[in-house]
């Protein structure tokens, strides 16, 4: 018989509470919604806030693991009075688990994720076959996965992963959905 430690039991309880809280927030915020623009790893929300402001007809959702980034995104949302934008502190798997199946992605955006440049760390990269399958499973027919990286090896890795995936086709000539400098791009300019 296997037993879990008290610390592990506490962690499982925290995870369950986090999912319950996330589910309640999503159910409250996304009533009657069927399609969203989704940004995984939205950081401070700069790009998504600008996009939402320029595209008020599109419902935008961003997730990130770091609480203060989500707070900054929500501050930007409030300052601009945007009703079509929501930020959630969530891990991708938990978000997809609690997101109602009736909601699909018209577009998924992934901007400048950590490239994990050392070969032994590549398994930590966000773009992996499993990630692409999960996102494809929630994406509308004709939906897009938009990716940018300032790390050429990671960009090439992503193109290779997409080319090898049955659900995605790479179109490097497709126009970018919206140009707006991200927080991390602005750091590079300094």
PLM regions with names:
Residues 1-38, 46-53, 76-102:
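S-adenosyl-L-methionine
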Residues 43:
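Conserved glycine-rich SAM-binding loop
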Residues 66:
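Conserved SAM/SAH-binding beta-strand->alpha-helix loop
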Residues 73:
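Conserved SAM-binding loop
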Residues 127-141:
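A short glycine-rich, Lys/Arg-flanked "PGG" loop and its adjoining helix->strand segment in the class I
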Residues 142-149:
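Conserved beta-strand signature within the Rossmann-like core of class I S-adenosyl-L-methionine
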Residues 165-190:
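Class I S-adenosyl-L-methionine
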